[in-house]
Structure formats: C-alpha cells, structure tokens
UniProtKB/Swiss-Prot annotation:
Entry's localization field: Secreted, Cell wall
Annotated gene: ENOD12B
Nuclease among keywords: no
GO cellular component terms listed in the entry, alphabetical order: extracellular region
Species annotation: Pisum sativum
Protein name (database record): Early nodulin-12B
Tissues and organs where the protein is expressed, per its UniProt entry: Root nodules, stem and flower.
Length: 86
C-alpha cells in the first residue's frame, strides 16, 4: 500500500515538473521575426534647409531699466550697515 502511494506521488510530482515544460510552446502560433543583424546602409547625412529668420525688432512699448538690488553687490547677504533690524 505504501509503495503504491509512494510511486503515485513520484509519478504525480514528475508530471507536475515535466508537463508544463513540454506544452509551453504548444498553443503559441509561430512568430515571424525580422533578422537580428540587419546590414548597415551607408546614407549621406541629410542637410537641413536654411530657415530665414527676420531680424528682431524692439517692442513698441517702453520698459524702464531695472535697478540692481543692493543684495547683488553683497552676494545676497546683508551687512551690518544695511540691516535695519539691529
């Protein structure tokens, strides 16, 4: 009785291991794949046609010049004479 159970267990485990590997590619359709190593085609580089860019004109509205902040001079750190909170 034990040998029948042991042999059926071994047969069942062997079927679990072997059957999925045997039927793995069975239901798949064959796939046409392009060749991996295609020959290289030497084409000359394509030259881009030059694009005409019209000269830039100044805008019609007036914009006053921006004054530089005193923070720019002192590397964005106030000194003691500029600090009004001391």
């Amino acid at each position: 009785m034990a040998s029948l159970f042991l042999s059926s267990l071994v047969l069942f485990l062997a079927a679990l291991i072997l059957v999925p590997q045997g039927f793995a590619q069975y239901h798949l359709n064959p796939v046409d794949e392009p060749p991996v190593n295609e020959p290289t085609v030497n084409k000359p580089p394509q030259k881009e046609t030059p694009v005409y860019k019209p000269p830039q004109k100044k805008s019609p509205w007036y914009m006053p010049e921006q004054k530089e902040s005193h923070l720019h001079v002192y590397d964005k750190h106030l000194t003691a004479e500029h600090n009004i909170h001391i």
